[in-house]
Amino acid sequence: MSLLEGIIDSRNNPLAVVEDIAASNNWPFERSGEDELTIVSKGQWTDYQISFTWMGEIEALHLACAFDMKIPVARRPEVQRLVAAINEQLWVGHFDLWTHTGMIMHRQALVLPGGLTASTAQCEAMLAGAIHASERYFPAFQFVVWAGKSTTEAMSAAMFDTEGEA
């Protein structure tokens, strides 16, 4: 790769946009490599580890928003049913249960073919969408994992929106 190609590649790397967003919001972040950046965001229920990865080979910016909840093996079948029920409600992104770690995460990707660049608005929308979905459904995961509730019970509780704060 020539020096010029390296400069063009670094300008088109959407992680620079994500890094600017994190810095402007005073969110702690870490670049673990030239193609990965992780932000820590405090939520109402838990802290979120939000990893953005630039996947040059498929020209996509991948987001994975994980929270600290390890799913016990005995509860995984019900959690998988809950993930399916939640994903039916989502228009953008999806939740996954990573079976090898037992972790839940919200994932989505922004495809940027042919050298397109990500805008600040696109990256902010990805970030906001992941946090919103995680905040909305975190209690449902808690109900299933720690309270032993069914998917139906957890979804009923998650779909109940309250007004204001107590």
Q: PLM ranges: what are they?
A:
Residues 104-108:
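Short, aliphatic-rich beta-strand segments
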Residues 142-166:
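Short, highly charged C-terminal tails/helix-capping segments
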Residues 20, 24-48, 52-63, 67-68:
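Ser/Thr-rich, low-complexity intrinsically disordered terminal regions
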Residues 66-103:
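Short, internal acidic amphipathic alpha-helical interface segments
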Residues 98, 109-110, 116, 122-135, ...:
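Long, contiguous binding/interaction regions
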Residues 2-8, 41-43, 74:
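Amphipathic alpha-helical hairpins
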Residues 1-20, 66:
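Terminal, regulation- and interaction-focused segments at domain boundaries
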Residues 6-7, 64-72, 116-120:
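Short histidine-centered catalytic/ligand-binding loop motif
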